């Protein structure tokens, strides 16, 4: 696997090694021994969301959970935002195309707001977490918060009530 730093402090982009032949493709998404070189976190929960085109989930995060995210099917526009006041990249954001073709993964430390916008008819978004979900411990950054100046490839995404309300950063 290839690992590289991103523009946001502590965020890693990871590309697993792929093996392709006439039968298709094989790749190892996660091996705890290999990931020991990338993070000391132990993942305890896996989650999947399935979304149709232009559904936007996020931006969500908390200050205690490390996440490993990827798209297993389709194409997603992943936008992440640094909401850690102590971080040298606080208030900055970065976007990535995650897809079943590039199989890129993002390792997100606590305090990073995480979102995925479905760009294909259907996406399957997969993420591992090193803590169990805790109701009421998450933050939501509003997708169109003017202080962040996010760029999205669509102007009217499909949002949940939670994401529609969101929260603005002071």
Residue ranges and their predicted role:
Residues 1-101, 122, 127-170:
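Non-catalytic, conserved peripheral segments adjacent to functional cores
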């Amino acid at each position: 696997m290839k690992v590289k730093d991103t523009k946001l402090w502590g965020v890693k982009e990871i590309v697993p090694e792929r093996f392709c032949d006439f039968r298709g493709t094989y790749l190892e998404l996660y091996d705890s021994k290999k990931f020991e070189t990338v993070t000391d976190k132990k993942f305890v929960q896996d989650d999947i969301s399935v979304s149709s085109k232009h559904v936007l989930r996020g931006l969500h995060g908390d200050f205690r959970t490390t996440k490993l995210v990827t798209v297993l099917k389709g194409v997603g526009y992943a936008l992440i935002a640094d909401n850690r006041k102590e971080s040298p990249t606080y208030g900055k954001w970065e976007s990535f195309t995650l897809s079943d073709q590039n199989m890129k993964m993002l390792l997100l430390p606590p305090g990073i707001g995480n979102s995925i916008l479905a760009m294909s008819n259907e996406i399957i978004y997969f993420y591992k977490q090193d803590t169990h979900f805790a109701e009421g411990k998450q933050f939501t950054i509003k997708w169109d918060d003017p202080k962040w100046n996010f760029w999205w490839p669509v102007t009217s995404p499909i949002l949940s009530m939670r994401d529609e309300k969101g929260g603005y950063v002071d």
